[in-house]
């Protein structure tokens, strides 16, 4: 059965050639990213436990996680958290299987704690955080759709939704993404442990000049005073400056913690390395898209991919799929830019979307007619192998934020 894949040329100025470009990334310690990370870790933990016990991933969506900021008194040399961060786990998951109670809450809380321990180094999970699981039983309608999908080799979409992907990344997009990855990388943390995980990078390109504004939570116990704090800021800027040389020849201006006012004693220091300790709240889906970026110059889906089940929820699967299709087209065909939009219809096989729209800006001297069939084939092959995405998710080969 032929798939509904439409390839067309669009006329627009590629983002790399536009006068103004905005790009954002919220690092893994940002409250919104913490919510995403916990939601996704719970979904993966539930999926693995369902598979272990029943041989199938049962219905769940754990994409409703709220991080409610606590209260802390940071100070150079080491402060304290006086009110813990409250994390609400919500969503739905099958809890009763053949009259046997499945330990949804235990699995979820364990996954959340393990995620925090692994990713937020200075957070004391037992004392700085309260985790409350309110995950409920799945919707009858959605569960029936999910169960019906078990009888088919290709799962049925449990929602009418769309996913969006684009490629290639611009220099600014790469720089913003790689900046956060560098600063939150294992090597950098060993060299400069004072840098917390709550790192937000905002990129602005005006013509051929890029401004990078970096908000980096500094861990108070790792710096003795203002002098050492300012030295840490300088080292951050120096590291990013070196990174930028490998990505772009454009002029890059780097600004770190611009709200600081040393004369007034104002510095961005934290006890735990995340602003969630001090009243900054977080929610799933309010941060990065599945490619790890927030890109107002591009098409984007508002779907929260983190925490959605990896079997039939197209809000997750189609966003990942669209990104993969776009990447492959950009790597192999003569295009300046490619945008992929995939729309499902609830209850229909996920490999048969209502439409897979592929919009391309051909490189100069090329026409879409030259490679229309090739673009179609790339999308068609990915759709034919769509269940690979579930496997990649459970093997932790894909990040969704």
Swiss-Prot record:
KW Transferase (keyword) present: yes
What GO biological process terms does the UniProt entry carry, in alphabetical order?
one-carbon metabolic process; S-adenosylmethionine biosynthetic process
* Functional pathway: Amino-acid biosynthesis; S-adenosyl-L-methionine biosynthesis; S-adenosyl-L-methionine from L-methionine: step 1/1
Lineage of the native species?
Answer: Archaea, Methanobacteriati, Methanobacteriota, Thermococci, Thermococcales
Similarity field: Belongs to the AdoMet synthase 2 family.
Protein keywords: ATP-binding, Magnesium, Nucleotide-binding, One-carbon metabolism, Transferase
Any idea of its EC number?
Answer: 2.5.1.6
For this chain, one GO molecular function annotation is: ATP binding
Record organism:
Pyrococcus abyssi (strain GE5 / Orsay)
* This protein's record includes keyword Nucleotide-binding: yes
- What does the UniProt record say this protein does? Catalyzes the formation of S-adenosylmethionine from methionine and ATP.
Q: Which reaction does it catalyse?
A: L-methionine + ATP + H2O = S-adenosyl-L-methionine + phosphate + diphosphate
Where does the chain bind ATP? 136-141
- Descriptive protein name: S-adenosylmethionine synthase
Q: Entry's InterPro entries?
A: AdoMet_synthase_2_family, AdoMet_synthase_3, S-AdoMet_synthetase_arc
Mind telling me which Pfam families this protein's record contains?
A: AdoMet_Synthase (PF01941)
Give the cofactors, semicolon-separated.
Answer: Mg(2+)
- Source species, domain of life: Archaea
């Amino acid at each position: 059965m032929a798939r509904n894949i439409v390839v067309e040329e669009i006329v627009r100025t590629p983002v790399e050639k536009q006068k103004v470009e905005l790009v954002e990334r919220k690092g893994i310690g940002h409250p919104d990213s913490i919510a995403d990370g916990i939601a996704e870790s719970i979904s993966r933990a539930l999926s693995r436990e369902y598979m272990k016990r029943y041989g199938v991933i049962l219905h769940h969506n754990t994409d409703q996680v709220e991080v409610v900021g606590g209260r802390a008194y940071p100070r150079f040399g080491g402060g304290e958290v006086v009110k813990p961060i409250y994390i609400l786990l919500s969503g739905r998951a099958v809890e009763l299987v053949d009259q046997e109670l499945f330990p949804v809450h235990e699995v979820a809380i364990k996954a959340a704690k393990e995620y925090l321990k692994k990713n937020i180094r200075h957070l004391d999970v037992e004392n700085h955080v309260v985790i409350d699981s309110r995950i409920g039983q799945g919707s009858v309608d959605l569960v029936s759709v999910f169960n019906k999908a078990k009888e088919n080799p290709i799962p049925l979409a449990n929602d009418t939704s769309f996913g969006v992907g684009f490629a290639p990344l611009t220099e600014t997009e790469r720089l913003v993404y790689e900046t956060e990855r560098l600063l939150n990388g294992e090597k950098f943390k060993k060299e400069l442990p004072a840098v917390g995980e709550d790192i937000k990078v905002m990129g602005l390109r005006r013509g051929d000049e890029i401004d990078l504004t970096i908000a980096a939570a500094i861990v108070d116990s790792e710096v003795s005073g203002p002098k050492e704090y300012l030295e840490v800021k300088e080292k951050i800027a120096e590291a990013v400056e070196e990174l930028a040389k490998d990505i772009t020849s454009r002029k890059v201006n780097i600004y770190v913690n611009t709200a600081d006012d040393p004369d007034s004693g104002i510095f961005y220091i934290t006890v735990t390395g995340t602003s969630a300790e001090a009243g900054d709240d977080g929610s799933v889906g309010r941060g990065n898209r599945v490619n790890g970026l927030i890109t107002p110059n591009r098409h984007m889906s508002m779907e929260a991919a983190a925490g959605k089940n990896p079997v039939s929820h197209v809000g997750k699967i189609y966003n990942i799929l669209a990104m993969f299709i776009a990447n492959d087209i950009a790597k192999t065909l003569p295009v300046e830019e490619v945008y992929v939009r995939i729309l499902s219809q609830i209850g229909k096989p996920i490999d048969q979307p209502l439409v897979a729209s592929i919009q391309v800006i051909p490189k100069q001297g090329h026409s879409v007619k030259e490679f229309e069939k090739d673009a179609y084939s790339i999308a068609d092959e990915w759709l034919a192998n769509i269940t690979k995405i579930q496997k990649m998710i459970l093997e932790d080969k894909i990040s969704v934020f």
